[in-house]
Swiss-Prot record:
Nuclear localization domain: region residues: 526-552
Organism: Dothistroma septosporum (strain NZE10 / CBS 128990)
Pfam families noted in UniProt: KilA-N
Induction, per UniProt: Expression is positively regulated by veA.
Sequence ranges assigned to domain HTH APSES-type in this UniProt record: 111-217
Ranges annotated as biased composition (Basic and acidic residues): 390-399
Protein name from the UniProt record: Cell pattern formation-associated protein stuA
Amino acid sequence: MNQPQPYMDQHAPAPPPASNMTQYSNYGAPQPLQPATHGYGAPTYPQYGQYGQSMPPMQAGHPVSAPMQGQMVNSLPLPTMSAPQQSGGTQQFQQSFDTTGQIAPHGMKPRVTATLWEDEGSLCFQVEANGVCVARREDNHMINGTKLLNVAGMTRGRRDGILKSEKTRHVVKIGPMHLKGVWIPFDRALDFANKEKITELLYPLFVHNIGALLYHPTNQARQSIGNATMAARRPESSQEYMRTPQGTQAPALTHHHSMSNPINASMPPQPHSIAPHPASGRPQLDRAHTFPTPPASASSMPMTNGNMPNSYEYGSAGAVNSASTPPSNSQGMPQYQTSQPPYTQSYSTPGSYSQPQYTHQQPGVQRFGNIHSSPDGVKTEMGPPARAGAENDHPDHKVGGYGGQQDAEGEHEGEYTHTSASYGARRLSYNYKPNPAPGPLHQDSSHVSPEMTHSPHQNGSGRATPRTTNPYTGYNNTPQRQNQLPSSNLNYVMSSDARAGAPNGQEYAQQAYQPAPQYPAMNGIKRGREDDDQVDPYGRPSSALGEHKRQRTDPGAMSARPISQPHSIKAGGAVRR
């Protein structure tokens, strides 16, 4: 009874029949005819009987009258002559059957999504109806006619016939499923929707300002297409623009706040371009990229190590510059010297040749020489201190006193074992041994080649066998050799292997096959030989026994030889077993 109340007020002269005859107020009947309308009011009710539960004439207090009157007013499509009085009814009629698609149906919420059509370079608004997604382009407002007619439940043949007859159409055969089909102009799509009575189902599709209805969970107050398209096209880039100033300026303040002013004033752009996001969980990248920055000012190098340890490897060199060293470094460096006094005393003598050894390998690091003599020099994160750590593992090997000649031996003994052709000029320093080796495993004279001392067959070949590459102990004259396993500290001094503290068996095996990479080692004991078919460069006659022994103990060498070429026995003689 709430809906037709304004119409009852307009026809107030006959209140009792007005409650029953309100559905006829839309006809604009004159006032004298209202008593007569009560006569034929009863026979007209049966056609609306499907809406009610009983057939008797309706009265004001009947419970069925309210839904009946509401439905009858909504279902009467007849035009009226009294336009001023029927303004409310005509507005309700236009809302229920809207042909423009601009007015939302009663109780329907607009649901629009937007995607970027990369192939066409346009934003597409999508509306779903009857399980079909109908898309509309933002640039030219064309609508996918194939999906539009699918919403109406049209057959494929009829749909294709209608779309083929369109003059302006754009056929899309690739891309997502909801974008494939025949695209037609906006007005033609609206005509098809009105003919098929699906305009209300596709309500937000034909709204002119459809971008304002774009569904966004966090911001539903958007009122312009520009904002909607910008949010849809750049959902992440806009956030990056917002957080980029926070990510670029912050590292310049936090990463370099401990440095002196010359570096901060001269190098501000470098942290901006290299470390845009300090909170990304990878701070080591910042330090690695800004690694060359601290040497620009020598006075600022210790500052980086004092506040940010291990951020710059140059910071550990602050101990050399005693004048500019802060308390953190000055307290840290003597701590190494006093914590283990026996090591520092034993290292005082060999420090004279350990520093030239670093000069050979890395000429630019001479200023770090004083640090490397400390037993904990490995923790300075520099390249050379790995060798210092290796020296610490065998401190008592060096007390016996080494000459400069043994330093040269350590340089070249790895080369002699494998690249024998390049060792011709250095052979004198290798063979020169005035004293017999006191090692427990070698009772022979040290002037004999090591391969003859370690091999069960006393052959005179100048090649090293897999048995001889393991313990190179025949040319050491340290008095401590009797109490230890055969190992040489020369390898630890001159080698560039970071695993210098490994046992001597593994250490020598690693050096054994490094110069010959084309024959990878199988177990760490065997090694590939690249000089099988070469004549001895030292001019010594090779024994037949040694050659046959290599054929049996090294299957890799057998596979390396050509099968068609027989391997002749050098220096003649029958093979003895």
